[in-house]
Regions:
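Aromatic pocket-lining residues of Rossmann-like dinucleotide-binding sites
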Residues: 44
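Nucleotide-activated chemistry modules centered on ATP-dependent adenylation/adenylyltransferase
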Residues: 1-39, 47-213
């Protein structure tokens, strides 16, 4: 069996290399929400010229989408380390999500439906990064203990090959990343949602709260 890759270590080695070479590459960072972005931005802004991409057609309902988008904008405007960070928000088209997960609606959270959602959002990031000549792209998603970092990186590497823009390896939950995101969320009084985003995860969460799952 092959050794499991340490994506957090791979990222640290890249950062050390860029620092030694006095390089600060451009990075398109797909962001799912403000809490997950907080610790990632704090870690990366000194080493990359970052543009944040908010593309999350999975989020339900639209009011929830708008709330998360507004919190991300507020975070970027308030963090001292994000003065140079740009934000791009792509149109909110929920049908893109439903098309991507068609036939997977009843698969439990954390399975193939989620992987299809990862790919949908990361592919939008890869396309944008390639079209705008970024040095790297990645996503904040791996900061969550509920997200499969190996799958995220495998998807990222496949998209890198497809679109010709390198994927930045990451497992942001490691090295106290998730713990730091909780602290920063408290520091900035960020809205922390209690479900991943889609209507299916919302229903699952509500069922668990009622003791039905």
């Amino acid at each position: 069996m092959a050794n499991k890759r340490n994506y957090a270590k791979e990222l640290n080695i890249l950062i050390e290399t860029f620092t030694h070479e006095e390089k600060r590459p451009t990075l398109l960072l797909h962001a799912c929400c403000a809490p997950c972005s907080s610790a990632v931005l704090e870690k990366l802004t000194a080493h990359f010229k970052i543009t944040v991409l908010f593309y999350n057609p999975n989020i339900y309902p639209e009011a929830e989408y708008q709330k998360r988008e507004a919190e991300l904008k507020r975070l970027i405007s308030e963090m001292p380390c994000t003065k140079e960070v740009a934000l791009v928000d792509l149109p909110y088209v929920p049908e893109e999500f439903f098309t991507a997960v068609r036939g997977l609606e009843h698969i439990p959270e954390g399975g193939e439906r989620c992987f299809a959602c990862y790919k949908l959002r990361m592919e939008a990031a890869a396309k944008y990064a390639a079209g705008h000549h970024f040095d790297f792209f990645t996503t904040t998603l791996s900061i969550s203990p509920l997200k499969n970092a190996q799958k995220l990186n495998e998807i990222g590497e496949a998209l890198a090959e497809k679109y010709g823009v390198p994927h930045l390896p990451s497992d942001f939950k490691k090295q106290e990343g998730y713990k730091r995101s909780i602290q920063l969320s408290a520091d900035y009084d960020l809205y922390r949602q209690d479900f991943c985003g889609c209507v299916f995860s919302k229903k699952e969460r509500e069922a668990k709260a009622r003791g039905e799952a």
